[in-house]
Amino acid sequence: MGSQGYLPDPQPPNLGGYLHTTYFGPISWYRQLLSADSWAIDEGEPYVKQTTRNHCLIATVSGVQKLTVPVEKSRSEERGARNGFSGSEPLLTRDVRISEHGKWRTEHWNALCTAYGESPFFDYYADDLRPFFERRDWELLIDYNMAIMQKMLELIAPSHLPQLGEAANGLFSCGRTIKNAPLSSGRGVGGEASYWQVYQRQNGFLPDLSILDLLCCMGPEAILYLRN
């Protein structure tokens, strides 16, 4: 994937601004994504650890569980670790590599099967989701997340795909579209109405979980919730 990003037309229609990439991002992120004709997924931003860039939140019988994709240390961090100081060169999101140490893919898939196996639509979407936890086709986190985003939109809002499937998969470098476009985390977008959740009796309603929660619980009606 090119490091220069995609340079869109000078005045793309209804550009919503910039969003950071997410791993099965929160519901509010997808609601915001669907609120404009197009968004810029910022691949040139400094990578921020411990965010939805590499983790998602799902519901379990015990409450919220975080699933984290491990990433490799940057060369700067490795040099700093060897020499006893912190790396000074910022790691850009487009350069973050997925770590294949451990069995995190299997652990994530097993967690999803346990959490949503009894949900109305998990079995219906399982074949679409499973490849992201079995295949190792993606070395870069940004590529992995973009493939996930495309699949989520294909399942939830296929009519939105043409805008996001254009050149370079909609990846833009910060500052290359419209001046003063806001940079958004994709969180905190308005109030969130409740919907039925698998463990609502035990936990009450858990807001703004991963898009996977909405997909498994509401299926084809997920788009109605996101558009509401």
List the model feature ranges, each with a label.
Residues 2-228:
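Residues lining hydrophobic/aromatic ligand-binding pockets adjacent to catalytic sites
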